[in-house]
Amino acid sequence: MKILGINASPRGSKSQTLRLVKTVLNGARSRDCEEEFVDLCKLNIEYCEACGVCYKSGKCRKKDDFQSLYRRMLSADGLVMGSPTYFRLVSAQMKTLFDRMADAVHCQLLTGKYTVNVATSGGLHNDREVTKYLNGIMLTFGSYVTGSTGTSVALGSGAMDAVEKKAFRLGKKLAEDIRVRRVYLRQERIHKENSAYFRQLVEMNKDEWIHEYDFWSRQKR
C-alpha cells in the first residue's frame, strides 16, 4: 500500500502543515504502508489556461512538474492533502494543482482511493473551512475521505500536540481503510451521483472531449 502526502505550505521546514502531513504519514507507516512526501511549493506547476487539451488527449500541454506529480497521485492507494489557510481557503499552490486536474474530475480518476486532509490556520477555527473544502474536493475527484483534522496555531503548542495525536490516528485509519477497502455509504452515494453527472456531461461533448468520451465508453454503467 502506497500513500502520497502533499504539503502545500510555502514555509518549508517551519511549516506546521508539513508537520501534520508527515504525522499522518507516520501513522500510516506504523501500519506497514509505503509513504512518499511531496513539498508542492518546490515544484513548478503553472496555472491552468482552460485550453481543453486534457479533455481531448488525457495529457496537459504544459511542460512543467504537474504530470510527474499527477502520475504519482494516480498510482497511490491513499493521499494526504495538507494546506495552510490563506483567507479562508487553501494556498495558491494547492488551488493551482486542483485547477490542473479537471480531467480527473470529469473521469473520476481518484475512484477507489482514500484521503486524509489536514489544515492549519492563524485565525480561530478557520482551518475547519479548509478541511471542509478539501473533503469536498477529494470527494468530487472520486476519492473516499477517511477523515480530516486541523488547528489554529495561535492556540499554542498544546493544541498542535493534540491535533498531532489525531493526525497519527488518522494515518493508521487510512491504512486500515485501504487494506479492507472500506465503503463509506454516504460518500458512495455522492460518488454515484457525480459519476452519472460527469458521464452525461462528457457524452454531451463527445465530439470535442475525445479522450474523456473514450474513457467513459469503456466503463460499465
Regions found by a protein language model. Name each.
Residues 66-69, 112-116, 133, 152, ...:
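Residue-level signal for alpha-helical context at structural boundaries
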Residues 48, 128, 158-159:
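Short, well-ordered secondary-structure micro-motifs
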Residues 92, 106, 110-151:
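Short, glycine-/small-residue-rich phosphate/pyrophosphate-handling segment
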Residues 10-12, 86-87, 120-125, 152-157:
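Short histidine/acidic/glycine/proline-rich micro-motifs that form metal-
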Residues 135-189:
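Active-site/pore-lining binding-face segments in mid-to-C-terminal subdomains
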Residues 1-83, 88-103, 165-221:
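N-terminal beta1-alpha1-beta2 submodule of the flavodoxin-like/Rossmannoid cofactor-binding fold
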